[in-house]
From Swiss-Prot:
Subunit and interaction comment: Homodimer. Interacts with ZBED3; the interaction is direct, enhanced by protein kinase GSK3B and casein kinase CSNK1E activities and decreases GSK3B-induced beta-catenin serine and threonine phosphorylations. Component of the AXIN1-HIPK2-TP53 complex. Interacts directly in the complex with TP53 and HIPK2. Interacts with DAXX; the interaction stimulates the interaction of DAXX with TP53, stimulates 'Ser-46' phosphorylation of TP53 and induces cell death on UV irradiation. Also binds ANKRD6, PIAS1, PIAS2, PIAS4, MAP3K1, MAP3K4, SUMO1, SMAD6, SMAD7 and RNF111.
Entry protein name: Axin-1
Positions of region (Interaction with CTNNB1): 433-501
Predominant localisation class: cytoplasm
One of the GO BP terms on file: positive regulation of JNK cascade
UniProt source species: Rattus norvegicus (Rat)
The organism's taxonomic lineage, starting at the top: Eukaryota, Metazoa, Chordata, Craniata, Vertebrata
Length: 827
């Protein structure tokens, strides 16, 4: 029997509707029986001379390896060949259809070289090693090595071990051609396919589609022709066109009955546009709404939309535009009669709508083609470089100007702040180095004498007329009340200036019997000066009044000198005695009363009289000088009375040190006159900022009766406190003076070690005697414990023991002013 392997006719009348395999009809073993009446024009276009296999799996297979070229009747295997492909890789590679389908899958995955290399190695091993084939074998070995092994980027080279590649390279270079030289590489590639590509092929869509349709579904033809038969390539889905490659088709164009010839081998934009209409419906009928993937890493793209690397329409309009135009309702309506002939029937419109939906599902979103980076405009360059540079320079200059303005403003604010804080009035090194003058606004809250001293500056005592200095100063202060105090480099005030300040400041005379003693009605300057003057008046009481006034003013000036050149001047005895002491609260109270004359001066200035700037007349000077002398004499009498009471300067200094840390004793009722006490309470706050300056003159002495009463009260308190403390604890507290860890007198420290813990617990318990019951209340964990407490004992050499205490009423022993115990759990 002559059996041809090509061009078997289709017997459409003998088709079966069942999917189960059937044996062939007797006498028709050589015929191909189709199980499906669908036309064969649904197949794919072949890539390299691949034909269409139209026979079914139920037809009698033609086996060239059998004696008759086919299997006899009754011996056909009931298992379809595509099911045997899933048994092993060799079963797949033994069948031509399986090889074709497997190669198609590998092409989609980009690893078809694995299968080609495997077949190349098999073919090289089958070459007989003879002299005639030696040259052919050498060329073939070199070709295999260069194409698959030498290229390090190829998939075969990547899947081959380096030792195997080195062995093949040595064989090729030394021309030691052996039939088994590629066996190791073939084994490695076969293992790779069995582990990766072969399982993926069995799960792929192309294999599942092939098995579902019983090998009758159209399939993409491979490079190698099937041994079962050949056919013509029909139009269908074109393969994916890569941007950097030119699509080629080596298949010869054969004409079919009733069919146009296949497209030419070269794919062009014009050809795609011409064949768009027939490709759209054919693709819909084949896929039935299913998507066919050409590669697992790439979205499906219909070649119709790939136009030389650029899209002709957006993705929304490119999705099956032919179907949209067919289903559009843009036809004109004929309203001549009752019929509407322009609208297609509802069934057709519904069918078109369903076709569009299926096409959208198949195509999906059409991705835009890749645009090379060189065609893209850089994002940074949006304007011309020259304009950009000008704008940048302009903005940078604006930023620089803003920063400079901010720096200047900060410098000005800093300068103003330093002026307000009295930076120019910083003291030189020495006793005045740690003190600063107050800021400018603070001068208005002080008595007139301090205001004059701060604003007039440090001037020479023998350089200018005191009256002119005073006039200039008053005018300047009234004109600019917030002026800056002069620095230390200026001149010190002279005696005339100080005397004039005292005269102008004390506008109210001291009337009444309390005024000469307490100085409440005198000006602030007199209050602060009399302690320097009265020590020298009683020695030379026969001197004239003018001389005493000049001497008093000179001594006051020497005590008020703030510059470094005045520290060598002679200081009065009382000043030297009181420089190391802080002024008492009573002194602050006496000095604070000086705000009354300043208020009167301010009222005069506001009313326009400007009395402080007027030079007093001769009669006024004489009257005020007389008042000053009267005040000096009264002060001398007061001091002599203090000395008779046996209160020396050392006691005063000690008492003042105590007074600085206690409440104001002058505020107590009964210490002074009730009205005076009220006035003093109102005038004490706020105190001067520089009242503790050691170079400032001391305030007048407080009432000695008040100081004696305060001293007696403190002594009584100390005696009461000493009687409460035991002698031993008082000695210990004196030894630990200054430490804040000493417990109060009515509490005791309790420390205990709980169940062998290395760190003790410490707490404070009220009372000196602590019982075991009180100690148990301190424990946070309740249970059965034994209690031991440390005490002094001579029984052992160590000198101490831990004594167990069991009774709750027992007093716990004390060790070094603490109760130290150990709590052990009873087993």
């Amino acid at each position: 029997m002559n059996v041809q392997e090509q061009g078997f006719p289709l017997d459409l009348g003998a088709s079966f509707t069942e999917d189960a395999p059937r044996p062939p009809v007797p006498g028709e073993e050589g015929e191909l029986v189709s199980t499906d009446s669908r036309p064969v024009n649904h197949s794919f276009c072949s890539g390299k001379g691949t034909s269409i296999k139209s026979e079914t799996s139920t037809a009698t297979p033609r086996r060239s390896d059998l004696d008759l070229g086919y299997e006899p009747e009754g011996s056909a295997s009931p298992t379809p060949p595509y099911l045997r492909w899933a048994e092993s890789l060799h079963s797949l590679l033994d069948d031509q259809d399986g090889i074709s389908l497997f190669r198609t899958f590998l092409k989609q995955e980009g690893c078809a070289d694995l299968l080609d290399f495997w077949f190349a190695c098999s073919g090289f091993r089958k070459l007989e090693p003879c002299d005639s084939n030696e040259e052919k074998r050498l060329k073939l070995a070199r070709a295999i090595y260069r194409k698959y092994i030498l290229d390090s980027n190829g998939i075969v080279s990547r899947q081959t071990k380096p030792a195997t590649k080195s062995f093949i390279k040595d064989c090729v270079m030394k021309q030691q051609i052996d039939p088994a030289m590629f066996d190791q590489a073939q084994t490695e590639i076969q293992s790779t396919m069995e582990e990766n590509t072969y399982p993926s092929f069995l799960k792929s869509d192309i294999y599942l589609e092939y098995t579902r349709t019983g090998s009758e579904s159209p399939k993409v033809c491979s490079d190698q022709s099937s041994g079962s038969g050949t056919g013509k390539g029909m139009s269908g889905y074109l393969p994916t066109l890569n941007e950097d490659e030119e699509w080629k088709c080596d298949q010869d164009a054969d004409e079919d009955d009733g069919r146009d010839s296949v497209p030419p081998s070269r794919l062009t934009q014009k050809l795609l546009l011409e064949t768009a209409a027939p490709r759209a419906p054919s693709s819909r009928r084949y896929n039935e709404g299913r998507e066919l993937r050409y590669g697992s890493w790439r979205e499906p793209v219909n070649p119709y939309y790939v136009n030389s690397g650029y899209a002709l329409a957006p993705a929304t309009s490119a999705n099956d535009s032919e179907q949209q135009s067919l289903s559009s309702d843009a036809d004109t309506l004929s309203l001549t009669d009752s019929s509407v002939d322009g609208i297609p029937p509802y069934r057709i419109r519904k069918q078109h709508r369903r076709e569009m939906q299926e096409s959208v599902q198949v195509n999906g979103r059409v991705p835009l083609p890749h645009i090379p980076r060189t065609y893209r405009m850089p994002k940074e360059i949006r304007v011309e470089p020259q304009k950009f540079a000008e704008e940048l320079i302009h903005r940078l200059e604006a930023v620089q100007r803003t920063r400079e303005a901010e720096e200047k403003l900060e410098e000005r604010l800093k300068r103003v702040r330093m002026e307000e804080e009295g930076e120019d009035g910083e003291m030189p090194s020495g006793p005045m180095a740690s003190h600063k003058l107050p800021s400018v606004p603070a001068w208005h809250h002080f008595p007139p004498r301090y205001v004059d001293m701060g604003c007039s500056g440090l001037r020479d005592a023998h350089e200018e007329n005191p009256e002119s200095i005073l006039d200039e100063h008053v005018q300047r202060v009234m004109r600019t009340p917030g002026c800056q105090s002069p620095g230390p480099g200026h001149r010190s005030p002279d005696s005339g200036h100080v005397a004039k300040t005292a005269v102008l400041g004390g506008t109210a005379s001291g009337h009444g019997k309390h005024a000469p003693k307490l100085g409440l009605k005198l000006d602030s300057a007199g209050l602060h000066h009399h302690r320097h003057v009265h020590h020298h008046v009683h020695h030379n009481s026969a001197r004239p009044k003018e001389q005493m006034e000049a001497e008093a003013a000179r001594r006051v000036q020497s005590s008020f000198s703030w510059g470094p050149e005045t520290h060598g001047h002679a200081k009065p005895r009382s000043y030297s005695e009181s420089t190391g002491t802080n002024p008492s609260a009573g002194d602050l109270a006496f000095g604070g009363k000086a705000s009354a004359p300043s208020k009167r001066n301010t009222k005069k200035a506001e009313s326009g009289k400007n009395a402080s700037a007027e030079v007093p007349s001769t009669t006024e000077d004489a009257e005020k000088n007389q008042k000053i002398m009267q005040w000096i004499i009264e002060g001398e009498k007061e001091i002599s009375r203090h000395r008779k009471a046996g209160h020396g300067s050392s006691g005063m200094r000690k008492q003042q040190a105590h007074e600085s840390s206690r409440p104001l004793s002058i505020e107590r009722p009964g210490a002074v006159h009730p009205w005076v006490s009220a006035q003093l309470r109102n005038s004490v706050q706020p105190s001067h900022l520089f009242i503790q300056d050691p170079t400032m003159p001391p305030n007048p002495a407080p009432n000695p009766l008040t100081q004696l009463e305060e001293a007696r009260r403190r002594l009584e308190e100390e005696e009461k406190r000493a009687n409460k403390l035991p002698s031993k604890q008082r000695t210990k507290s004196q030894r630990k003076a200054g430490g804040g860890s000493a417990p109060p007198c009515d509490s005791i420290v309790v420390a205990y070690y709980f169940c062998g813990e290395p760190i003790p617990y410490r707490t404070l318990v009220r009372g000196r005697a602590v019982t075991l019951g009180q100690f148990k209340e301190l424990l946070t964990k309740k249970g059965s414990y034994r209690y031991y407490f440390k005490k002094v004992s001579d029984e052992f050499d160590c000198g101490v023991v831990f004594e167990e205490v069991r009774e709750d009423e027992a007093i716990l022993p004390v060790f070094e002013e603490k109760i130290i115990g150990k709590v052990e759990k009873v087993d």
